[in-house]
Structure formats: C-alpha cells, structure tokens
C-alpha cells in the first residue's frame, strides 16, 4: 500500500514565476525519460519480481521515491505558473518584448487544459504513455534499462540546470541530480550481481540454440572501418571479437505468392 504525507521529499519553490521554465520541466515529468517513466517502470518491475527480496525491495523503494519526484516537479511547475499572464492584448506584446517572449514560449495547454498546473505531457504536449516504461520479467534486462533511464534523466536535468538562473529551481535540480547518481550506481551494482549469476548476455541460456559462429563477428556495413579496432579484443563473455570486412548476403532473393485478388494489390 501507499501512504501519502503532505510534506515534499525536498524543496520545490522557485524564486519567481517562469512559464517558459515550467514548460521545459515538463520533459522531466512526462517525457520519455521523465519521473513518471521511472515511477511506473520500477514499481511494475518490483511488483512482478518473484526472486530475491533484495531486488524487489530496491525496485519498490526507488519506484516509490519516484512518486515523490513526480510530486516535487509537479509542484515546481505549478508554482512557476503562479501569476503568469494568461491574457494579453496585441498592443501589450508590441510594447513589452519580455511579455511577448513569455507568452510566445509558454505551453498554452498549461492554461487552456490544466488551469495553470502541471500535466503528464512533454514540453510539446505529447502525452506520457506506457510504452515508455519497461518491465520484462528479466531483471538483468530491466536493471540495464534502469541504468539507461537514470542516465538519460540525469542528463536532461543537467541541461535544465543551465537553462535557468533561478536558485530555487536549481536547488531542486541539484537534489534530483544527486538522487539520480545514487539510482544509477545502485542499479549498476544490481546489474553486476545478476550478470555474475545469469551471464552478461540476455537471456544467458541460448548458446546451444543460436548459430554461435555469428555471435562475436563485427560485420562492416559502412564505408568506414573504425570498428575493426575491436577485432581480437575480448568480449564480456570471455570470447574474442572477429571482423568481417565484406559481409556476405546469405539469404538469397525473397519471393512471394500474389495476394488475394480481392485485396487489389496491383503491383505489375
């Protein structure tokens, strides 16, 4: 179960309204790598975990913390929109370039759809969707996704940090940067432990089935040959990479039977 407390995990109070920054912060909320994606991914992974309680608790702890981050960013966005102009005459735009910039850059959905509050959208109004989240049932794969998600989220927060001089916003972003450092490191550690147990390739028990002669071949499919530098190096599974300069077309020319005439696939 969840139990809500009205106190935020950390400060989320800007120095002044800024609807442009409110729009930018929507990426860290409802974007592909935003906090909603982390929340739904980690909670789903934790709920479906039937293995070690250590990993289940790690995922549920972090997923629940992501709810707090959703709350913080939503609060920050709402506060950035407090007092922002929602009506302006054409003459006002001409006489006040700053107002024109604000009104031109703010997300109209903040006012029209959400009443000057946050939304589960990215800055361009695209709604968050469950396709951003991952819960495969394989914790090696999921932990790798989690490292990527935290890396992308931290990268975006670092970019947002330099898009504002507001110390209140920066204070919250500094906290998020630190927490995403922790989350990257914890998921990396879990990934390493799981790889030691199950192998570095996901899934790790298919060697007897796959065509292993292709498993460690770098195939040159471009004009450059920079990837040749990996030739002879040892992969994480202990095998050496080989290099194929001119990959062979081994599958022949595909042919197909005509479609049903009622489909009118007139193709000559």
Task: Describe these PLM feature segments.
Residues 1-268:
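Non-heme di-metal
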